[in-house]
Amino acid sequence: MYAIGYFLIEYLDKPFSDEQSLTALNLYVRNWFLDKFKELTPPQKFAFKLINDKFNVLITAPTGSGKTMSGFLSIISKLFDYALEGKLENRVYCIYVSPLRSLNNDIYKNLSVPLDEIYAQIIKNKGMDIIKNNIKKVSVGVRTGDTTQKERRLQLIRPPNILVTTPESLAIMINSKRFIENIGGIEYLIIDEIHELASNKRGVHLSLSIERLMAIVKKNVVRIGLGATIYPLEEAAKFLVGYSAGNTLRECKVIDASWSKKLEVIALSPVNDLVHTPNKDIDNAIYKKIDSIIKNNRSTLIFTNTRSGTERVVFNLKSRYGYGNDIAAHHGSLSKDTRLEVEEKLKKGELSCVVTSTSLELGVDIGSIENVIQLGSSKSISRAVQRIGRAGHSFKSIAIGEVIALDRDDLIECSVMVDNVIKKRLDSFSTPKNALDVLAQHIIGMSLNKKWGVDEAYDLVRKAYPYNTLDKNEFIATINYLGGKYLGLEHHRVYGKIWYDEKEGTFNQRGRLSQVMYMLNLGTIPDDVAINVFTLDKKWVGSIEEEFMTKMKQHDIFALGGKLYEFLEAKETRCIVAAAKSLTPTIPPWFSEQLPLSFELAQYIGEFRKKLGDTLSLKQKNKSINKKADAILNLMPIDKNAKKIIYNYFIEQFLYTKIIPNNELILIEDTFEPNSTKNKKHLLIFHSMFGRRINDILSRIFAMELGEILDMNIDIILSDNGFILNIGELIVNSQMIDEIISNISSANISTMLKHNIRKTELMKRRFRHVAGRGFMVLRNYKGNKIGVRKQQLNSQMILKDIDQIDKNFPLLKETYREILYDLMDMPRAQQILYDIKEGKIKYKIIKTKFPSPFAHKMLIFGGLSNITLENTQQYLQN
């Protein structure tokens, strides 16, 4: 048991007995459970009794551990108690929220059957007393963006007792008078995949919706959080329960059964040499390995990191090994019907393999998976645990998986990642704090419910964990913006969204159109430019990026959903296709941002580099593995190929530079671009093992300082393992670098970075997102959807003028916060600079004729030199 501030977090390590757990359920529910399941799972031995006793509970447990049943069964039991007493009303008692519509559909199906079966037992036992005593069946319903108008009307007339929904639909419901009547008496709230929500603005949005709902309910509601890979648990618990009156965090019981399922996973290299083996042979080896795993298992799930990678793997498996309809792709750009069909077939055992990017990462029910393959690093330990954990769909089964590396740096990353999976470590997440765009959206929503006092509204907002530290001045500034108090915005058609009486200190609804505007524009997910793909018979296939379509010419062939299509023509935002006869595709590149390496994994890689690097010696005359290094590598969950490749890679770096950069030592190479004879570009290569989110900050501020000294704009190549500064033909010396590091270690880097990003495309794009969430730029006006291009144009025009209006304008301030704290990692970057200043992290500057081996991947994928994918192999060999 730990007391944190005024918040009592109780970590439970002693489960209740089976008898205590089962007697918490009523007779019919208990009999149904014992008939269906042989025993209680670890989380159920805690949860059944705790939820029955009305405690707030956070449950973390792996896929297949009965986690969902842990959250629901005590609630179902209580609702059947009400039914047996003739007191079950036509209203909502429990709201279940998840980030995925597909997960909601699963929950609906998985609850409907137990509810039917339990009620059938009651009918069998009670007979005609069912009618006499008004014993109703417990009902469940789904309310998402996919719910039809007819279903919504029926829910208003006869609301389900358990309502399954999404954060966005919940926000709509708390602004509907009819729905408020039905949900105003809820007793339970379940948040599934809580870590997935709490780490982003969808979760921030949800937290305010929950506190607004609590203000409507005016009583304690039991809160239940579910997730598979949650760390730190305190952060998730605080997000779940929030604060009560008096700024005291509510109590929460924490059930940590996250490692109750055994994982067997190995990192491997498809060949014994990832440099000198031809690309074609490496590809052949990868697909041969995948084919072997598929054939040796009843069902295999393959994860890639991109949708284009998913399409490529499906196409290659079909073309190389003759797979047909027994293999399928699953990702977010495919139609809902296609995704549901794949999920159903996989669950029924009709597919031997499904390839996915992230869409099957969370707990969608896909039945029993025997094996999981991860192609390349997942960039996160938690993500690896989540993905590998999809194998073995029961708490006693072993989750078996392989992580196949694609190059030498990827191999080190995969090896350290898998090692930490085995060591039961996770990455940490943090919740965005005081997001002013989401706040603005909810203030508008609140104004539609009633007239609010500013202090009353401020107190309510601060009950949500992400806003507990919100400054009153920022709250007032946001209300001033929404109240139309900023002069100069009218000519951009930005008008007041609420009535705000500054003297009285109150705000409320502004005009009849406010409700429509709110309902049509709420949510936190920004609009993307996507082109819908249709066949000639008007069947929707999926979507592609607009930028990709502009590159296509008539009769080009591309892959989507694991099938080939011929491009026929473009009609506005539609792409018309036909089934392709050719076997040569153009795989569509989705231009989504590449996943950044987590800070924790970056640090573990740095520690591994130091540990293995300390075993190396310049006296070593050959590449045979020394005893100390052999002992370290033998403890890693890697194959023989991986062991040999990693050691050779380290030896190459060490013999060339005498240094292995790590988490305590930054190597700075003063070198020149390879593969050019005249006008060689001068490069400064920083081997900083902190991940891209931090390296983004370090590279920008270093480039700013150096650029000012040299009077030039400096090109940056950014990676997870470091960054490269291209200074052209100019020369720097070590003293200059020392001075810059000294300056930036004590500088106000937040101010520097704001100046750096102010005119960038990144700022323009992110401001559009923030302005959309904050209702400054509408995405829909009176039912007419406003295109992304129009939104972008409107937001850029506003951004040009906003500094002159107020440099601390709430949505401008929020854009900077989102970039520096959500996209980048300002707190950790500041800590690293402090550690450099204090000497805890050291740096070494060396001159090299050519970039060292550890720099090669940065150069190749940064596109600085004229290295193409075709001659990458040759470059690395040289």
Language model segments and positions:
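Conserved pre-motif I regulatory segment
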Residues: 11-60
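Helicase motor core with emphasis on the C-terminal RecA-like subdomain
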Residues: 52, 74-84, 89-168, 175-449, ...
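Walker A/P-loop
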Residues: 55-74
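Short, well-ordered loop/turn sites that connect or cap secondary structure elements
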Residues: 525-527, 552, 559
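A conserved acidic, glycine/proline-rich C-terminal tail/linker
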Residues: 540-556
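Short beta-strand-centered aromatic/proline hotspots
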Residues: 565-568
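Short, solvent-exposed secondary-structure boundary/capping segments
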Residues: 571-588
